[in-house]
Amino acid sequence: MELVVGRVAKSHGVRGELVVEVRTDDPDARFAEGTVLRGRLPRSTEVREFTVESAREHSGRLLVSLAGVDDRSAADALRGTLFVVDSAELPPSDDPDEFYDHELEGLSVRDTAGAVLGTVTEVLHSAAGELLSMRAAEDGREILIPFVTAIVPTVSVAEGYVVIDPPEGLLDPE
């Protein structure tokens, strides 16, 4: 399974730097100097390899320089490029309470009594922590669930579900 670890949002400056929207939990490793990235170009099935020359944070954004991308027009041509990795290449986690996003997406969401409430559609990473986005089985609306042990006490990737113990009001329609 191919996983997106970053997306080129736009160019930055005139020397070919790229603003990359990070979609990985470890950008320091993924975008380290010398790392070879596979990039899926927009509106194309072509995948190219790019070597990271440098990466730095600037105003809360990741700026990346790639070998051979030396000016603004070359950087602009990469706008929308998705940097991808194969999930089979990811190392297994040493922590049983740590999961890759793709392992959680698609899991059934149950309450503590076992009733199916919905499906995890996405894992969102925010400054305040991770959130599970759930599509409610009842009406299809999106519900954001803080991914903390107090609210999500059980995760069973092997059995295909998470159990939530929602605080009052979390599941209520607005």
Swiss-Prot record:
Keywords: Chaperone, Cytoplasm, Ribosome biogenesis, rRNA processing. GO terms for cellular component: cytoplasm; ribosome. InterPro entries: PRC_barrel-like_sf (IPR011033), PRC_RimM (IPR056792), RimM (IPR011961), RimM_N (IPR002676), RimM_N_sf (IPR036976), Transl_B-barrel_sf (IPR009000). Residues 96-170 form the PRC barrel domain. Pfam families: PRC_RimM (PF24986), RimM (PF01782). It is found in: Cytoplasm. GO terms for biological process: ribosomal small subunit biogenesis; rRNA processing. The keyword Transferase does not apply. One of its GO terms (molecular function) is ribosome binding. Binds ribosomal protein uS19. The PRC barrel domain binds ribosomal protein uS19. Belongs to the RimM family. An accessory protein needed during the final step in the assembly of 30S ribosomal subunit, possibly for assembly of the head region. Essential for efficient processing of 16S rRNA. May be needed both before and after RbfA during the maturation of 16S rRNA. It has affinity for free ribosomal 30S subunits but not for 70S ribosomes. This is Ribosome maturation factor RimM.
